Amino acid sequence: MDFFYKYLALVAIASLMVFILLFGQIPKLKYTVIGKLNRFFMVTIPYHLHVLDSRYADGRCSAAMRSLSNYVLYKNNPLVVFLYLALITIGIASFFIYGSSLTQKFSIIDWISVLTSVLLPYISLYIAAKSNPGKIDLKNWNEASRRFPYDYKIFFPNKCSTCKFEKPARSKHCRLCNICVEKFDHHCIWINNCVGLNNARYFFLFLLCTIQLLFHSILRLGYHFNALRDMRQYPSFLRSWWFAIKSEGELGSVFLISLICSVLVLCLLGYEFFLVYAGYTTNESEKWSDLAHLVKNRKVYMYYENGSQLLALDKDASNDAILVTSMSQIDNIYDNGFYNNFFSLVFPYRHLYSTT
């Protein structure tokens, strides 16, 4: 294979690895091939490397790797943000440096369109990274504690050992940012910030701005390469496309990387929209997954008290409690339908709850 084929193979493998590492721990994929590969790369391989290191190097390599991984994974740092910025900046620079045959034909509208598309990811990243995710402190605790009721299924009154106050329903203490966050979704390494009640909308904006840049790149370069296809020399549709892309390798690389990265970002965006549809956050999806595991093992019973559905484990269930055989039997009080869920994401403080 020549360099171009090797480069494409490397990009494809790297993208697959990123997909496995990003999505392998999602509850829906935990027991699929993706989840198994994630555990293989994140658990099995490190374990065997540690065994070899302990045997032949007295554990020195493992200690160094633990120190590095602790900084990357468990310390609030901007490394992945810099990686994101480097990727899109190199791609944009390559487009303008090697795409003079396109840009010299641009009209004013084209330039406005391209420059707007280029600037949006930088602006949205800054907004998402600098936004307050919904930090809870003593000043706003009363308001935050009334925002959502406890469902007594996945959220119960519980004190935060770090912040020293009772955690409001749907909140969580982020060990990276060292704050409690309202309606905690997850800590996002791509924006180096938590995603919570106040800035989930900005996280969505960041994803949308990223995907529009990738789509813009795919459409413009795709149109360009389609015009370069030589159907007389390469009558096959795919071969004519392939050789058109190879004829301008630098732009071809930008096109292919945009194509592959767009799949990754679309998967992430699709998963986030699924969570909105389902009426829970990434953090809550893990709790619901644990509950589903208990239901599958026939360990959960339900009963009603003052019109509210409550759950109990088999050992604590009363005689009149009903065995839960399906997750569809369990009410999610935080799910108000896709429209209302999305509305509350965009306008987070126009909430639908009024607890006392």
Swiss-Prot record:
Compartments where found: Endoplasmic reticulum membrane
Claim: Transmembrane is one of the keywords in the record: yes
Intervals, Cytoplasmic compartment: 24-78, 129-201, 275-356
TM regions (residue ranges): 3-23, 79-99, 108-128, 202-222, 254-274
Superkingdom: Eukaryota
A GO cellular component entry from the record: endoplasmic reticulum
One Gene Ontology biological process: protein targeting to membrane
GO molecular function: protein-cysteine S-palmitoyltransferase activity
Lumenal side: 1-2, 100-107, 223-253
Residue ranges occupied by any DHHC domain in the UniProt entry: 158-208
Keywords, in A-Z order: Acyltransferase, Endoplasmic reticulum, Lipoprotein, Membrane, Palmitate, Transferase, Transmembrane, Transmembrane helix
InterPro entries reported in the protein's UniProt record: Palmitoyltrfase_DHHC (IPR001594), PFA4/ZDH16/20/ERF2-like (IPR039859)
Documented EC number(s): 2.3.1.225
Membrane topology: Multi-pass membrane protein
Catalytic activity: L-cysteinyl-[protein] + hexadecanoyl-CoA = S-hexadecanoyl-L-cysteinyl-[protein] + CoA
Function recorded in the entry: Palmitoyltransferase that targets several endosomal SNAREs. Palmitoylates the SNAREs at cysteine residues close to the cytoplasmic end of their transmembrane domain. May have a role in the cellular quality control of transmembrane domain-containing proteins.
Domain topic, free-text comment: The DHHC domain is required for palmitoyltransferase activity.
The family this protein is said to belong to: Belongs to the DHHC palmitoyltransferase family. SWF1 subfamily.
Designated name of the protein: Palmitoyltransferase swf1
Protein's organism: Schizosaccharomyces pombe (strain 972 / ATCC 24843)
Name of the coding gene: swf1
